[in-house]
Amino acid sequence: MHASASQDKNRRKPGHDEGAHNPDYENITLAFRNKDQLKLSQSTPTKQAKFKTSLDPAESPPWLYRTIMMLYVLLALVFLSCIVLSALVLVKNSEMSKELWTLKAELSNVSDTVWNIRELQNQQTRIWEAAQGDIKEVKKTLGTVMSSIQTGNDRLKTVPADITQIKKTLEALEKKAQPQPST
């Protein structure tokens, strides 16, 4: 609103009594040496006001095009960096996928090894239990054999007495079987 009032002041002829009815208006007159300076001073704010309010592309400043081009270049660089980062992410993802497959294979091998170890432990437990049963059986058999040997030893102890008894019986029989001399 203030800018439009200053434009109106510049367009009107000097000496127009607009401020007579307005208490905020100050009538300021400037002394210029020639009329060219007056025209330049009056035309400069008008051009500035037109430049600020104008949206015409023909009147846009040259730095605006450079700035827009820089923004496009920055946008292209950001886009390229996104592509590069995406490619890096894909490469890393591929590497991690390979590592995961390797780890999965190693884990499978470890789990197979653990399963084999458990099976071997179960088999070893079964063999140990069978060996313990066989040892108990052998101990029982040894007990029976020892008892039989002891019984045999006890019988052998009586054999010499039996042999002497048999010898005495044989001698007695021999005596009876010999003819007696007649007298």
UniProtKB/Swiss-Prot annotation:
The record lists the organism as Mus musculus (Mouse)
Give the bilayer topology. Single-pass type II membrane protein
Q: Topological domain, Extracellular: which ranges?
A: 92-183
Subcellular localization(s) per the UniProt record: Membrane
Segments passing through the bilayer? 71-91
Which stretches of this protein does UniProt put in the Cytoplasmic compartment? 1-70
Q: Which InterPro entries match?
A: MCEMP1
Cystine crosslinks: none
Print the keywords alphabetically. Glycoprotein, Membrane, Signal-anchor, Transmembrane, Transmembrane helix
Biased segments, Basic and acidic residues type: 15-24
- In Gene Ontology terms, what is a biological process of this protein? Kit signaling pathway
Q: What does the entry list under GO cellular component?
A: cell surface; membrane; protein-containing complex
Q: Which residues are glycosylated?
A: N109
Name of the protein described by the UniProt record: Mast cell-expressed membrane protein 1
Q: Main localization of the protein?
A: membrane
